[in-house]
Amino acid sequence: MKISYNWLKQFIKTDWTSEQTSELLTDLGLEVEVVEKYQSIKGGLEGVVVGHVLTCEKHPDADRLKVTTVNIGLEQPVQIVCGASNVAAGQKVPVATIGTVLYDKEGAEFTIKKGKIRGQESHGMICAEDELGLGTSHEGIMVLDDALEPGTPASVVFKVANDEVFEIGLTPNRADAMSHYGTARDLRAGMLQRGVNVELITPSVSNFRVDMRTLKIDVNVEDSHLAPRYCGVTISGITVKESPAWLQDRLKAIGLTPKNNIVDVTNYVLHELGQPLHAFDAAKINGKIIVKTLPEGTKFTTLDDVERTLHKEDLMICDEKGPLCIAGVFGGKKSGVSEGTTSIFLESAYFDAVSIRKTAKRHGLNTDASFRFERGIDPTITEYALKRAAILILEVAGGKLTSDVVEVYPKKIEDFSVLLNFSHVYKIIGQEIPKDTIKKILVSLDIKVNSVSDSGLGLTIPAYRVDVQREIDVIEEILRVYGYNNINFSKKFNATVANSPRTEDYKVQNVIASQLNSQGFHEMMANSLTTAAYAKLSASLKEEHNVTMLNPLSSDLSTMRQSLLFSGLEAISYNINRKNSDLKLFEFGKTYHKYLNGFEEHKHLSLLISGNRNKESWTNPQKTTDFFLMKGYVKGILARLGIDKISNAPVQSDIFSEGTAICYNNDTLVEMGVIKKSILKHFGIKQEVYYADFNWDLILKIITGKIKYSEIPKYPEVRRDLALLIDQSTTYESIFNLAKQTEKALLKDINLFDVYEGKNLPEGKKSYALSFTIQDNTKTLTDSQIDKIMSKLQQTFETELGASLR
């Protein structure tokens, strides 16, 4: 694999030399076998400078030669004999000075020497473009821009690209490093470990914007196992032509031959990010894109003009009339981009590695795309790479984005979970590495540390690290980055067999438990065994789903619980009967269910509150718990977990007399409300009980693990109040959402501080008093700016909600 040093430095800003970088890459396991110099013009035009022809006289002994004096930036001009018919005094020309090495068309070198031509000394050569490798013309010398200064290096004038290219002997398991970005990611980890503070720079795709939606091509993936993720977008109005010099130089440096600007961009992104892409001529696509297999024996002609016979398991990219491309391996002749192409469908996908490997082997094909798909690419950058390529195509080929990104991604590809035991690290490596160092190394490799204990770490491994799925793999990563040279080898070597402890994700649970403890909650741990009769208390629980014990100790302990509610109500009842009626309880626990296809376990977090909010005190008047108190606790937990993209929905469970559900992407995260009196009566409870049930399994899947913080604003915030007369059916949430949509940038907070329903109001109306906090983080707001925002909010409320000011 070839890696350009200049390209690498786009992702890692460093002043390290190529030698230092090469050594570190080798230490990290990315063995640099050769470092080659690359120059966009062979020889780099070293020794060639701009010359100013001062005089040009006919050679005294040769009709076709001229004797010139040329200023090449030295103290004295030099004499050069030239045979070109177009040389003349006053010109600025390229001059190859004494000792310069030039190359002919076949690549053979020749050196410029001082000599005599027909008795006249010549101290260099005025060059034609073919002599410099800038073209094929030999009609005459090159005449340069008159504004150039004598002595200016030609490499500067002609913008010769100089680079150093690492030839890396990449092992098959390191699919994550098969790109410049992946190599830079490893390099960052190694540099951080060596005390060099660097950041990994990711190219931005923030300016990806659809110009018009005039060419949408739908996608149908018939086998999501073979194509777990597929994205596409259309670009119209492009011009297929030669790529700009910078793009050609990038590709040439790593040994690729530029084709045209569209193909070159797909190759560029492939080697930049490791994501294979394919561009189809959109005009040649009939109907929609269909990803499927075709019958055994189907004929298909690929880009190399070879007719191939397809296997029934070959995954194909087709349209409604037939095949277009062998998925992840090779394009088809009829659908490829040509000089006449004006619109394209750009594909970015994640294909099954085993399927691609078998297809490539069957057809004897080994392409850059199949090479990466076979080893496993990063499933999380499919859309990002598509946007990156689309932006580059717009830059080098013009055109407009004419569709939204079409994506088929039915089931998210999950990351790997590994539990790392510190003692096992020591046993394998033979030397104790500080725990903080281990954590820093793992974080630098984009491995998330989910939980920390004295004995080890709970880790989440990115899906693109297909080679790191076990504890021993993690230890290898630690050792690789820590440095083999930093390990002291003893004379005696010990070998042990490591155990695999179960994976735990207690860190998040402990954080939330601590938060609830600080809010006055007590943690409870109820028995998972309960009575089968509880399933009859709710229609949402089914008796046929009960997991029953074969030999229970009693009928009250005969069934694995389907809900945490009833064991919680048992605890509430127990405490009330002992004169402890002000309660805040929580429990992390599992529920158990039997279905036709087997058994399932689901982890939940339950909250129960009942009685008074606080203990009786002369400073705090007695106030009972209510739904809004519970809602505050729930929202606080979600905020602590960094879950903010939530919405409310009607509660589905029939255990509540009143309640609501909080959803994330249409999946229910939490159900909460007041428990029905009929259920409370079964437990002998006469006071209201509020209950919240968190789907903890789902929460663990969606939390990001890191919460971003921002500095305290330097500029003051401003509060403005509105008293709105609204319909009884209007909710605070609808006002909140509408306000946020109306003023996204400067509206920081909204608070409902008074509700009035009663006399002097029209029938069916109520009054809400709301405060609006407005702030600009970059400057102090003026009264006119604030008034404009408040006027916009007022008009929106009047238009959308029929509200009026009181």
Positions of the model-derived regions?
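Conserved mixed alpha/beta core segments that line enzyme active sites in large multi-domain catalysts
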Residues: 49-80, 151, 253, 260, ...
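Extended, well-folded interaction surfaces typified by the phenylalanyl-tRNA synthetase beta subunit core
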Residues: 418-581, 720, 773-777, 785-806
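Glycine/proline-enriched, intrinsically flexible loops and inter-domain linkers
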Residues: 5, 23, 27, 39-40, ...
